[in-house]
């Protein structure tokens, strides 16, 4: 009944997968059921998208973390990614190859991309992708003075097995950075 009453709304779900080793058997079964059911709802269009996050993957991306600051550090990595992607989705890029996401591409995760090397680290491991969107946040100085930037980004887009698009957004930050949204139509199995 609840899902029927919100069917007309665009709902995005952020699913944070806890480390399986920290869960009791009943909790593992609950996580598995919830995880799969929410993905099926996203695939069927009940949800606009489900963004998958794996605390273990985020922890590995960050590096060594103290126990006292563990969850705070994870949150300080995840929240800015989501915030910047939301800001960029509502901003005009300086250059863009973005088109609409495919209707079937509702199971998603996020990544951080090294602007110089193109190395990508995802916050949830994904083998199967059908499209990826890259959000390059580039400072004004680099946009004006770096003659290699455009070719570097184009080169990073080549060789991708999935449909890839990018947007370049001007920022006032000293460092350039890039986030990715990785989409799939396939359910992730636990």
Residue ranges and their predicted role:
Residues 1-190:
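Tubulin/FtsZ superfamily GTPase core signature
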